[in-house]
Amino acid sequence: EAIIEEKIEKYIDGEIEEIPFAKREEIGCATDFSVGRNRYIGYLISLPTRSFKNKRVGLDCSNGSASAIAKSVFDALGAKTFVIHNEPDGTNINTNCGSTHIESLQKFVVDNNLDVGFAYDGDADRCLAVDENGNLIDGDLIMYVCGKYMKENGKLRNDTVVTTVMSNIGLYKAFDREGIKYEKTNVGDKYVYENMVQNGHSLGGEQSGHVIFSKHATTGDGILT
């Protein structure tokens, strides 16, 4: 992966004079895989061990890729789902909405007396949450909650969570109280996952909301989180 990124950087920086173009017969073809949506939804709803029955859940889909998926998942899990920013038009993705503008969801949750809210970014690989009072639950707190739960249930491999240098010291103090070990990487979910693979860890993430569960995915997945 690093080698590929270096080559791309050289193309961008102009260090390589000629960029090779694929021949017409080698380009390939486009395939309709619309069934993938239902497969993905089916996979997500197969994972939780607890129901959202009668929970009032707010979703901010950031006018992005979660717009066609998230509500179906929470509906299937029994939630009473309320959604904002789920009408992408090709230009409004992440515009004053989603996990980068959490204040929109905070107001929505409080105004509608919801139990919890989840905000995604445009490509839905990040998730931030909001409690019933509109308080932000960032990636650090999500990792703490998930790490504690997984440790208590014997699912936190090596009793370790992989974080980045951006995580708050409060997270590490909380981990210490729970007997959870931690490792720090450079900023970037790719570095988090690299550490997880090398050391066999099952949970890692960033304060920004990228959270990786290595048993289920190789990248952050906001809806899965």
Briefly describe each language-model feature range.
Residues E1-V110:
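Gly/Ser/Thr-enriched, mixed-charge loops and adjacent short helices
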Residues A2-I41, S46, N133-Q207, V211-F213:
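Proline/glycine-rich low-complexity loops and linkers
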Residues L44, D60, I102-Q106, F118, ...:
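Buried hydrophobic positions in well-ordered alpha/beta secondary-structure cores of metabolic enzymes
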Residues S62-A68, A124-D125, S167-I169:
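Gly/Ser/Thr-rich loops at beta-strand to alpha-helix junctions
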Residues N63, G122-R126, G134, G209:
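Short, glycine/acidic-enriched loop or turn micro-motifs at the edges of active sites
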Residues N112-L114, G200-H201:
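Short, high-confidence coil segments that cap the C-terminus of an alpha-helix
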Residues Y120-G122, L136-L141, A217-D221:
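Short glycine/threonine-rich catalytic loop with a Thr-x-Gly-x-Asp
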Residues S208-H210, K215-T225:
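Non-catalytic, conserved peripheral segments adjacent to functional cores
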